[in-house]
A protein has these predicted regions:
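A short coil-to-beta-strand element that immediately follows conserved catalytic motifs
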Residues: 132-143
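Extended charged low-complexity segments that act as oligomerization/scaffolding linkers
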Residues: 147-149
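A short catalytic or substrate-binding loop motif that flags glycine-/basic-rich loops and adjacent residues
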Residues: 21-27, 153-155
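Conserved Nudix-box catalytic region and its N-terminal flanking loop in Nudix hydrolases
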Residues: 39-127, 131-132
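Short, basic/aromatic recognition patches
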Residues: 12-21
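Compositionally biased low-complexity segments enriched in polar/charged residues
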Residues: 2, 21-22, 192
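Nudix hydrolase/Nudix homology domain
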Residues: 8-11, 50, 98-108, 113, ...
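Short beta-strand scaffold segments in enzyme catalytic cores
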Residues: 28-35
């Protein structure tokens, strides 16, 4: 099947419809969640992928860091402060950084060996929402998402489907989350200024309109 390509300042994303998800190691599945009043829901990650990658490259917990200025625009302010504290030399002026950054993701994760796709999604959606979201049903259509991370030259492949949930948008936006991964649930429609918005909306629109 043909694929649609999106390119942002940090990613090249290929999206295509598929008929099934292969069963192999390290398969990741995600969902565009649809509220009972038909609004698409995504999540804001508590930690940016850039900060996570930088910290994973440390030789020790107390290592000093050398960080490209280009990476700072893809981190939260508290992470930039932590990076600044560990720099080999100099400091980072937070006032010069775009404070509106937000790391958007879809709910989901890695399939455990004994799980089906839907079982994995149900578990991940419950865990990442602090058990506030309850699943009504899953859609049948599938999309394969291939992402090339231009910042760190890494490639990721995942799969996505629709998940209908029982809660309304207003109820979901009132939730306070305390888990380690997700800081907030959000309406996708409200995130049009985010660098991932165009391809996330394309995924949503493709899945919701598939026959």
């Amino acid at each position: 099947m043909s694929s649609t390509i999106f390119e942002t300042s940090r990613e090249i994303v290929s999206i295509e419809k598929v008929d099934e998800i292969p069963r192999s190691k390290s398969i990741h599945v995600f969902a565009i969640c649809i509220t009972s009043d038909n609004k698409p829901i995504i999540a804001a990650r508590r930690t940016s992928f850039v900060f996570q990658e930088i910290m994973s490259q440390r030789k020790s917990p107390t290592s000093t860091l050398k960080v490209s200025k280009n990476l700072l625009r893809y981190m939260y302010n508290n992470e930039i402060k932590e990076i600044s504290r560990r720099l080999k030399k100099g400091i980072i002026l937070i006032n010069n950084i775009n404070s509106s950054f937000e790391e958007l993701i879809l709910l989901g994760g890695k399939i455990n060996k004994s799980e089906s796709v839907n079982e994995c999604l149900q578990r991940e959606i419950q865990e990442e929402s602090d058990y506030h979201l309850t699943v009504k049903c899953f859609g049948q259509e599938l999309i394969k998402i291939s992402i090339y991370d231009k910042l760190f030259e890494k490639k990721y492949i995942s799969y996505c489907k629709i998940c209908h949930i029982n809660e309304t948008l207003s109820t979901i936006l009132s939730f306070k989350l305390y888990n380690v991964e997700i800081r907030e649930l959000k309406s996708l429609i409200d995130c049009s200024n985010n660098d991932k918005y165009k391809y996330l909306f394309f995924i949503y629109n493709t899945l919701i309109n598939s026959k």
